[in-house]
């Protein structure tokens, strides 16, 4: 059986109250000064502030536009679903190592599914993770199609924004997890000169250097470029593991007039070492070992010669042309090739765990020793994935009487091929590890004893074609969004070992409807219904691939986005159900069967505000009540890794006057409630709170405008905690205190 790469969801029962009161006199981003004109006085009128674009930078931490929820450049308050945007401005405050770290203050998103590991950006959104072993992440509106262990990640330094859309999204994107998706927006060329160099050094021997250059190539701004890159090396938290990353993203824009834009986008990333990607048992983490002690937070159960590497190549473009005031055509296209290679020994629970009931090594131990000897397995894996995606859209703006329409019609196509050449070690393929006196040694990954290991050589192919239509119809203050999509999703799996092929072709219609009411004061209540479908990659006892799971959601919410202030406050109540979930065979076979159901009900609140030029505040609260409502084994239980409560609060203050002028001080806290550690709900992972801090100094005062030096601290008090568990044998230590010094120079 293949080693599971993706952790699954969970529950929690503790209550938290977070009260934030902020009193601020009315402020605006822009200030005006009125001077009574005198004779012969020349009056200069300032140009209006540039309009924020859904595909460009936001001036503050509170983005007002997004295309993730509609595929059109839409104000956030007009989208009938919950959307959170983490801007480059906000990422600069925290300097995250990964995109999932950048989302730490975002509601409805669990980022601790792998603890301190940043190998992948795995997320659980509204209680649901992506099916199987894949992420549900997008870049510039196109899915970063992954398969098995072969998932791409993007470095946050390369991004303009990271956006979370919560709830089913199949009406626009086709097959998808019901919980929602992550869409990242690349940095794009500017016509204004940008020259940035950045240096970082910190905990775990971190050293990183990055650069970001952009400018127009001609006097008229018809041609422009951007070149962003970085190199990073560090030790992972777990002893003996390393992280190395080299990335570069060349981009080029041709804009012959104000109606046409063609931007070439590319991304190349090489990671000789992606860091630690193992797991630990609940004994020694959540619970003490029989000797009363716990494993250290830097414990590594793998072999000394474990390796995990990844290489990513992506090229594509974004094109849009406005024919007139009515019609605009857009097309996004990308070709990607990803390679992943690993030799990994990983833990599989202590010998007393039922998961090791068939281990001969464990059976040979005395009963008193089974609680502190760790069973281990291994995987040798080489994969090559190729993916082509294209999305073509026609936007039409017109009116029918008093109703203004933004009509979007589109067709997208995706083709993926992943060639997997793997070998899995089963029970007794790796020597046991004494957790009282662990000695990590090299492992012979070439041994491949057929008595306890075997090949896994699979060629997976997937295709998806979708046609969709969406109308955003506004009459006075009432906005109705209605959309539908029809998908043809095909998948084929060739087993090179058995010489067999499994195929499945699915056709699915999904739709979304929503109503928003736009009050003049910036308050917008809304209601929506949306659907999703998600094909399975697993095979049943009849040898056929399972039918897709389906999701449906009802959401009621309110958004507050005042016209003249950079403030975005949202709140939502949702009821989300995933049907046709896989569950254990009631007849007792080792195969799963269809027919399960999971329901998640939740409440989310988020506030992002640049209250003044000096003050930023970000706060969120999440309540999720998830439950297996239909299941052979787990009915009534809560999925693993889904805390019932999460909350966060961040604030920073910048001094502009006096001796502290240029200094920024910031601090924040992140609370994650307790969660269940396995689908059987046999144990719980405790709640935890970590505190972050920032000290930054703007070097403009010493003649270096746009440059700064900063000190970022995550987990300020070095709280030791277990981030989550997906089973009794799979738990993850949370990140230790991270101290990073950053120097950013612009010239």
Predicted regions and their residues:
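Outer-membrane beta-barrel translocator/receptor signature
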Residues: 157-160, 171-250, 256-260, 313, ...
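Gram-negative outer-membrane beta-barrel transporters
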Residues: 477, 575, 594-678
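Acidic, small-polar-rich N-terminal luminal/periplasmic segments of exported/outer-membrane proteins
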Residues: 3, 39-193, 197, 532, ...
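Face-selective signature of the C-terminal outer-membrane beta-barrel domain
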Residues: 315-337, 376-494
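Conserved C-terminal beta-signal and adjacent last beta-strands/turns
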Residues: 16-21, 29, 383, 406-407, ...
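Acidic/polar loop-and-plug regions of large Gram-negative outer-membrane beta-barrel proteins
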Residues: 232-236, 249-322, 337-385, 430-460, ...
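Structural signature of Gram-negative outer-membrane beta-barrels, strongest in the C-terminal barrel
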Residues: 253-257, 385, 404-416, 458-578
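Membrane-embedded beta-barrel scaffold of Gram-negative outer-membrane proteins
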Residues: 320-322, 327-334, 338-346, 525, ...
């Amino acid at each position: 059986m293949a080693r599971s790469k993706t952790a699954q969801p969970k529950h929690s029962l503790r209550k938290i109250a977070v009260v934030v009161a902020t009193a601020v006199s009315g402020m605006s981003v822009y200030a005006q000064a009125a001077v009574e004109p005198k004779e012969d006085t020349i009056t200069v009128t300032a140009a209006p502030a540039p309009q924020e674009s859904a595909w460009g930078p936001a001036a503050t931490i509170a983005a007002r536009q997004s295309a993730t929820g509609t595929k059109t450049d839409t104000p956030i308050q007009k989208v009938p679903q919950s959307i959170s945007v983490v801007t480059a401005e906000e990422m600069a405050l925290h300097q995250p190592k990964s995109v999932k770290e950048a989302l730490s203050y975002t509601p409805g998103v669990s980022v601790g599914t792998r603890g301190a590991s940043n190998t992948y950006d795995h997320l659980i959104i509204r209680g649901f993770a992506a099916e199987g072993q894949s992420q549900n992440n997008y870049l510039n509106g196109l899915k970063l199609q992954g398969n098995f262990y072969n998932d791409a990640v993007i470095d946050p330094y390369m991004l303009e924004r990271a956006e979370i859309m919560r709830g089913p999204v199949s009406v626009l994107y086709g097959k998808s997890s019901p919980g929602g998706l992550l869409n990242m927006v690349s940095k794009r060329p500017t016509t204004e000169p940008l020259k940035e160099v950045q240096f970082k050094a910190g905990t775990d021997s971190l050293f990183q250097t990055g650069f970001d250059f952009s400018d127009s190539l001609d006097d008229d701004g018809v041609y422009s470029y951007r070149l962003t890159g970085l190199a990073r090396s560090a030790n992972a938290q777990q002893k003996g593991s390393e992280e190395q990353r080299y990335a570069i993203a060349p981009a080029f824009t041709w804009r012959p007039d104000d109606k046409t834009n063609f931007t070439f986008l590319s991304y190349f990333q090489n990671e000789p070492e992606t860091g630690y990607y193992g797991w630990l048992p609940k004994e020694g983490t959540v619970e003490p070992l029989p000797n009363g002690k716990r494993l250290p937070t830097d414990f590594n159960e793998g072999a000394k010669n474990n390796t995990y590497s990844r290489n990513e190549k992506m090229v594509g473009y974004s094109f849009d042309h406005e024919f007139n005031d009515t019609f605009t055509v857009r097309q996004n296209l990308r070709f990607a090739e990803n390679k992943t290679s690993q030799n990994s020994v990983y833990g599989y629970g202590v010998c007393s765990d039922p998961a090791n009931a068939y281990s001969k090594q464990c059976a040979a131990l005395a009963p008193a020793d089974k609680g502190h000897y760790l069973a281990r397995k291994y995987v040798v894996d080489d994969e090559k994935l190729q993916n082509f995606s294209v999305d073509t859209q026609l936007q039409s703006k017109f009116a029918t009487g008093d109703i203004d329409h933004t009509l979007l019609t589109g067709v997208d196509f995706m083709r993926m091929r992943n060639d997997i050449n793997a070998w899995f070690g089963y029970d007794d393929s790796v020597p046991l590890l004494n957790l009282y006196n662990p000695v990590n040694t090299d492992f012979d990954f070439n041994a491949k004893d057929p008595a306890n290991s075997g090949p896994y050589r699979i060629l997976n192919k997937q295709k998806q074609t979708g046609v969709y239509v969406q109308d955003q119809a506004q009459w006075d203050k009432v906005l109705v969004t209605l959309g539908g999509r029809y998908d043809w999703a095909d998948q084929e799996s060739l087993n090179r070992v058995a010489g067999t092929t499994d195929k499945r072709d699915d056709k699915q219609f999904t739709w979304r409807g929503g109503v928003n009411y736009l009050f003049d004061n910036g308050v917008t209540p809304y209601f929506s219904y949306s659907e999703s479908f998600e094909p399975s990659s697993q095979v049943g006892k009849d040898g056929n691939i399972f039918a897709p799971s389906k999701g449906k959601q009802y959401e009621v919410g309110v958004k507050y986005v005042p016209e003249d202030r950079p403030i975005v406050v949202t709140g939502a109540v949702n009821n989300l159900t995933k049907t046709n979930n896989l569950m254990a065979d009631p007849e007792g076979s080792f195969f799963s069967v269809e027919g399960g159901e999971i329901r998640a009900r939740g409440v989310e609140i988020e506030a992002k505000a640049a209250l003044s030029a000096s003050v930023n505040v970000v706060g969120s609260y999440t309540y999720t009540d998830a439950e297996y409502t239909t299941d052979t084994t787990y009915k009534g239980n809560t999925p693993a890794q889904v805390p019932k409560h999460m909350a966060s609060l961040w604030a920073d203050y910048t001094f502009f006057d006096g001796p502290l002028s240029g200094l920024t001080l910031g601090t924040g806290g992140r609370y994650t409630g307790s969660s269940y550690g396995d689908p059987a709900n046999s144990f719980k992972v405790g709640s935890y709170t970590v505190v972050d801090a920032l000290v930054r100094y703007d070097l403009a005062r010493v003649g270096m405008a746009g440059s700064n030096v900063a000190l970022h601290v995550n987990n300020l008090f070095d709280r030791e905690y277990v981030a989550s568990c997906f089973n009794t044998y799979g738990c993850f230590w949370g990140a230790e205190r991270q101290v990073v010094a950053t120097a950013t120079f612009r010239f």
